[in-house]
């Protein structure tokens, strides 16, 4: 699994519905979301409250509750978490305030907290303690992770804010760490194709989805061979 430097986005490898009350998507950047004048209505995903990833746990540093997590929890939790992060990112990209380091870069750092919680556990399980159901989940999620990543890195409005900050970086009064974060973030967006034409971005999306699926299958084959020869 490969993590981008500046925010929790997964771009590589990666199911128990219960009748409890669902948890509604909540934004970790609610202050930004409230200021967004262009919020686009979408169907709200829900996550059953019986899913261990639906809420914070009592363990230190939100350590995974492996005794409660089952294979069937991952896909709904991951889909919910991606929708949650997309809502957070859209709020940042669509806000009317001029871009600042705080309302753009710092806000981006705060997105996808649930996604990271679920994805790290999922990645560890698929790499070290997998089974047939996890493999199916991994194959299902791989192109969705790729699409989620592209929705962020190919977001024109989001990149415009980052690009504006980058071009004015000498006047922002940033410390060395903040400056480095801005530079790396800008570089990551460029490498992901943020300045490509709309047509080329569509080609990139298709290639990324294919690479993600192939990489997932390749990783599964390697793990299978290692296990069979152990």
Regions found by a protein language model. Name each.
Residues 8-12:
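Gram-negative bacterial Sec-dependent N-terminal signal peptides
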Residues 14-17:
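C-terminal motif of bacterial Sec signal peptides marking the signal peptidase cleavage site
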Residues 19-230:
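Zn2+-dependent metallopeptidase catalytic domains
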Residues 1-7:
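Bacterial N-terminal signal peptides that target proteins for export
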């Amino acid at each position: 699994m490969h993590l981008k430097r500046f925010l929790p986005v997964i771009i590589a490898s990666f199911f128990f519905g219960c009748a409890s009350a669902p948890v509604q998507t909540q934004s970790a950047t609610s202050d930004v979301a409230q200021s967004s004048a262009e919020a686009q209505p979408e169907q709200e995903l829900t996550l059953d409250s019986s899913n261990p990833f639906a809420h914070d746990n009592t363990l230190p540093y939100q350590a995974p509750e492996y005794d409660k997590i089952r294979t069937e929890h991952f896909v709904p939790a991951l889909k919910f978490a991606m929708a949650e992060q997309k809502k957070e990112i859209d709020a940042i990209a669509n806000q009317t305030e001029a871009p600042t380091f705080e309302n753009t870069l710092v806000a981006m750092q705060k997105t996808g907290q649930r996604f990271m919680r679920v994805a790290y556990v999922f990645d560890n399980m698929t790499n070290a303690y997998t089974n047939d159901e996890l493999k199916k989940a991994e194959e299902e999620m791989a192109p969705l992770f790729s699409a989620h990543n592209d929705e962020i890195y190919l977001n024109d409005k989001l990149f415009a804010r980052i690009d504006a900050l980058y071009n004015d970086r000498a006047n922002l009064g940033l410390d060395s760490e903040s400056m480095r974060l801005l530079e790396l973030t800008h570089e990551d967006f460029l490498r992901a194709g943020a300045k490509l034409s709309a047509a080329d971005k569509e080609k990139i999306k298709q290639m990324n989805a294919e690479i993600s699926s192939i990489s997932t299958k390749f990783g599964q084959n390697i793990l299978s061979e290692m296990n069979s020869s152990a």
